[in-house]
Amino acid sequence: MCIRDSPETVRDIAFQIKDIKELGVEIGIVIGGGNIYRGMRAEKQGIDRVTGDYMGMLATLMNALVLEDALKKTGIAARVQSALQVEKIAESYFNKKAIEDLEKGRVVVFACGTGNPFFTTDTAAALRALEIGADVLLKATKVDGVYDRDPEVHSDAVFFSEISYIDVLNKGLKVMDATAISLCMDNNLPVIVTNIKKKDNLKKAVLGEPVGTIVKGVDTL
Protein backbone atom coordinates (compact mmCIF):
# COMPACT_ATOMS: atom_id res chain seq x y z
CA MET A 1 0.00 0.00 0.00
CA CYS A 2 1.51 3.29 -1.01
CA ILE A 3 0.59 6.82 -1.96
CA ARG A 4 1.03 6.22 -5.66
CA ASP A 5 -1.55 3.42 -5.67
CA SER A 6 -4.95 4.29 -7.07
CA PRO A 7 -7.62 5.38 -4.57
CA GLU A 8 -9.44 2.13 -5.36
CA THR A 9 -6.41 0.01 -4.41
CA VAL A 10 -5.86 1.89 -1.16
CA ARG A 11 -9.55 1.61 -0.31
CA ASP A 12 -9.54 -2.12 -1.06
CA ILE A 13 -6.62 -2.71 1.28
CA ALA A 14 -8.30 -0.65 4.00
CA PHE A 15 -11.45 -2.76 3.67
CA GLN A 16 -9.36 -5.96 3.85
CA ILE A 17 -7.94 -4.70 7.13
CA LYS A 18 -11.43 -3.79 8.32
CA ASP A 19 -12.64 -7.34 7.59
CA ILE A 20 -9.85 -8.73 9.76
CA LYS A 21 -10.52 -6.21 12.50
CA GLU A 22 -14.16 -7.27 12.62
CA LEU A 23 -12.99 -10.79 13.50
CA GLY A 24 -11.75 -9.35 16.79
CA VAL A 25 -8.09 -9.44 15.79
CA GLU A 26 -5.69 -6.81 17.12
CA ILE A 27 -3.74 -5.33 14.20
CA GLY A 28 -0.45 -3.47 14.08
CA ILE A 29 0.94 -2.47 10.69
CA VAL A 30 4.52 -1.59 9.83
CA ILE A 31 4.54 0.27 6.54
CA GLY A 32 7.40 0.80 4.12
CA GLY A 33 8.31 3.76 1.96
CA GLY A 34 10.16 2.21 -0.96
CA ASN A 35 7.62 3.55 -3.43
CA ILE A 36 8.88 7.03 -2.55
CA TYR A 37 12.50 6.54 -1.52
CA ARG A 38 14.88 3.79 -0.41
CA GLY A 39 17.83 4.68 1.80
CA MET A 40 19.96 2.01 0.11
CA ARG A 41 19.86 4.07 -3.08
CA ALA A 42 21.40 7.07 -1.34
CA GLU A 43 25.08 6.37 -1.94
CA LYS A 44 24.49 5.79 -5.66
CA GLN A 45 22.93 9.24 -5.78
CA GLY A 46 25.78 10.88 -3.88
CA ILE A 47 23.79 11.12 -0.66
CA ASP A 48 25.16 9.94 2.67
CA ARG A 49 23.62 6.57 3.62
CA VAL A 50 22.47 7.79 7.03
CA THR A 51 20.76 10.79 5.46
CA GLY A 52 19.20 8.53 2.85
CA ASP A 53 17.85 6.18 5.50
CA TYR A 54 16.20 9.07 7.33
CA MET A 55 14.67 10.18 4.03
CA GLY A 56 13.30 6.65 3.66
CA MET A 57 11.82 6.82 7.16
CA LEU A 58 10.00 10.02 6.27
CA ALA A 59 8.62 8.26 3.20
CA THR A 60 7.09 5.59 5.46
CA LEU A 61 5.43 8.35 7.45
CA MET A 62 3.73 9.68 4.31
CA ASN A 63 2.42 6.20 3.51
CA ALA A 64 1.28 5.71 7.11
CA LEU A 65 -0.81 8.88 6.97
CA VAL A 66 -2.45 7.73 3.73
CA LEU A 67 -3.32 4.36 5.28
CA GLU A 68 -4.58 5.93 8.50
CA ASP A 69 -6.88 8.18 6.49
CA ALA A 70 -8.18 5.28 4.41
CA LEU A 71 -8.86 3.19 7.51
CA LYS A 72 -10.75 5.99 9.21
CA LYS A 73 -12.93 6.39 6.12
CA THR A 74 -13.99 2.74 6.48
CA GLY A 75 -15.04 3.43 10.06
CA ILE A 76 -11.99 1.86 11.71
CA ALA A 77 -10.19 3.76 14.48
CA ALA A 78 -6.50 4.05 13.60
CA ARG A 79 -3.41 5.70 15.04
CA VAL A 80 -0.01 6.40 13.52
CA GLN A 81 2.93 5.95 15.86
CA SER A 82 6.28 7.19 14.62
CA ALA A 83 9.76 6.09 15.68
CA LEU A 84 10.87 9.66 14.91
CA GLN A 85 9.38 12.61 16.77
CA VAL A 86 6.88 14.41 14.55
CA GLU A 87 4.39 15.45 17.20
CA LYS A 88 2.16 17.60 15.00
CA ILE A 89 1.19 14.71 12.74
CA ALA A 90 1.79 11.45 14.64
CA GLU A 91 2.25 10.09 18.13
CA SER A 92 5.75 9.06 19.13
CA TYR A 93 6.15 5.29 19.34
CA PHE A 94 5.96 3.77 22.81
CA ASN A 95 5.22 0.09 23.05
CA LYS A 96 2.95 0.33 26.09
CA LYS A 97 0.87 3.01 24.38
CA ALA A 98 0.72 0.88 21.23
CA ILE A 99 -0.53 -2.10 23.23
CA GLU A 100 -3.09 0.11 24.95
CA ASP A 101 -4.37 1.37 21.58
CA LEU A 102 -4.59 -2.19 20.27
CA GLU A 103 -6.54 -3.31 23.32
CA LYS A 104 -8.97 -0.42 22.76
CA GLY A 105 -9.69 -1.72 19.28
CA ARG A 106 -7.56 0.67 17.28
CA VAL A 107 -5.36 -0.30 14.36
CA VAL A 108 -1.85 1.00 15.00
CA VAL A 109 0.23 2.00 11.99
CA PHE A 110 3.94 2.10 12.80
CA ALA A 111 5.99 4.60 10.80
CA CYS A 112 9.67 5.50 10.42
CA GLY A 113 11.03 2.00 10.83
CA THR A 114 13.08 1.48 13.98
CA GLY A 115 14.05 5.16 14.01
CA ASN A 116 17.65 4.19 13.28
CA PRO A 117 19.59 4.08 10.00
CA PHE A 118 20.84 0.77 8.54
CA PHE A 119 17.71 -1.13 9.62
CA THR A 120 15.11 -2.23 7.09
CA THR A 121 11.33 -2.14 7.24
CA ASP A 122 11.43 -5.93 7.62
CA THR A 123 13.53 -5.63 10.75
CA ALA A 124 11.22 -2.92 12.08
CA ALA A 125 8.25 -5.21 11.47
CA ALA A 126 9.88 -8.08 13.36
CA LEU A 127 10.87 -5.79 16.21
CA ARG A 128 7.43 -4.18 16.58
CA ALA A 129 5.72 -7.58 16.37
CA LEU A 130 7.84 -8.83 19.24
CA GLU A 131 7.40 -5.65 21.27
CA ILE A 132 3.60 -5.81 21.12
CA GLY A 133 3.49 -9.56 21.68
CA ALA A 134 2.08 -10.46 18.26
CA ASP A 135 1.16 -14.08 17.57
CA VAL A 136 2.26 -13.92 13.94
CA LEU A 137 4.01 -11.57 11.52
CA LEU A 138 2.18 -11.29 8.21
CA LYS A 139 4.26 -9.96 5.34
CA ALA A 140 2.00 -8.65 2.59
CA THR A 141 3.82 -8.52 -0.71
CA LYS A 142 3.25 -8.65 -4.48
CA VAL A 143 4.06 -12.35 -4.97
CA ASP A 144 2.23 -15.43 -3.71
CA GLY A 145 4.82 -16.43 -1.14
CA VAL A 146 8.41 -17.66 -0.94
CA TYR A 147 10.16 -19.09 -4.00
CA ASP A 148 13.66 -20.44 -4.56
CA ARG A 149 14.22 -17.49 -6.92
CA ASP A 150 12.35 -14.48 -8.26
CA PRO A 151 9.11 -15.78 -9.86
CA GLU A 152 8.72 -12.56 -11.81
CA VAL A 153 11.99 -13.32 -13.60
CA HIS A 154 12.07 -17.13 -13.58
CA SER A 155 8.93 -18.95 -14.74
CA ASP A 156 10.24 -22.23 -13.28
CA ALA A 157 10.78 -20.83 -9.77
CA VAL A 158 9.87 -23.35 -7.06
CA PHE A 159 7.24 -22.31 -4.51
CA PHE A 160 7.51 -23.24 -0.81
CA SER A 161 4.25 -23.65 1.12
CA GLU A 162 6.32 -23.76 4.30
CA ILE A 163 9.98 -23.38 5.11
CA SER A 164 12.16 -23.04 8.20
CA TYR A 165 13.93 -19.88 9.27
CA ILE A 166 17.30 -21.58 8.97
CA ASP A 167 16.60 -22.73 5.41
CA VAL A 168 15.66 -19.18 4.45
CA LEU A 169 19.00 -18.00 5.81
CA ASN A 170 21.07 -20.86 4.38
CA LYS A 171 19.50 -20.60 0.93
CA GLY A 172 19.76 -16.81 0.91
CA LEU A 173 16.07 -16.49 0.01
CA LYS A 174 14.75 -12.96 -0.34
CA VAL A 175 11.86 -13.31 2.09
CA MET A 176 13.05 -10.75 4.61
CA ASP A 177 16.52 -9.56 5.44
CA ALA A 178 18.72 -11.78 7.61
CA THR A 179 18.37 -9.57 10.69
CA ALA A 180 14.57 -9.76 10.56
CA ILE A 181 14.54 -13.53 10.02
CA SER A 182 17.04 -14.03 12.84
CA LEU A 183 14.87 -11.98 15.21
CA CYS A 184 11.85 -14.10 14.34
CA MET A 185 13.84 -17.33 14.64
CA ASP A 186 15.34 -16.42 18.02
CA ASN A 187 11.88 -15.60 19.39
CA ASN A 188 9.90 -18.30 17.55
CA LEU A 189 7.66 -15.77 15.80
CA PRO A 190 6.04 -17.36 12.73
CA VAL A 191 5.98 -15.36 9.50
CA ILE A 192 3.33 -15.69 6.79
CA VAL A 193 4.23 -14.29 3.37
CA THR A 194 1.25 -13.71 1.07
CA ASN A 195 0.09 -11.69 -1.92
CA ILE A 196 -1.77 -8.56 -0.81
CA LYS A 197 -3.11 -8.02 -4.32
CA LYS A 198 -5.29 -11.14 -4.14
CA LYS A 199 -8.66 -10.41 -2.56
CA ASP A 200 -9.20 -11.77 0.95
CA ASN A 201 -5.67 -13.24 1.21
CA LEU A 202 -4.98 -11.31 4.40
CA LYS A 203 -8.19 -12.53 6.01
CA LYS A 204 -7.56 -16.11 4.88
CA ALA A 205 -4.06 -16.00 6.36
CA VAL A 206 -5.39 -14.74 9.69
CA LEU A 207 -8.01 -17.51 9.69
CA GLY A 208 -5.27 -20.09 9.17
CA GLU A 209 -6.17 -20.98 5.61
CA PRO A 210 -3.29 -22.10 3.35
CA VAL A 211 -2.39 -18.95 1.46
CA GLY A 212 1.20 -18.01 0.82
CA THR A 213 4.18 -19.41 2.70
CA ILE A 214 4.64 -19.92 6.41
CA VAL A 215 8.15 -19.51 7.80
CA LYS A 216 8.75 -21.14 11.18
CA GLY A 217 11.05 -23.34 13.21
CA VAL A 218 12.28 -26.73 11.97
CA ASP A 219 10.59 -28.52 14.87
CA THR A 220 7.16 -27.17 13.88
CA LEU A 221 7.29 -28.06 10.17
Which sequence ranges carry the predicted segments?
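C-terminal catalytic "cap/lid" subdomain
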Residues: 4-221
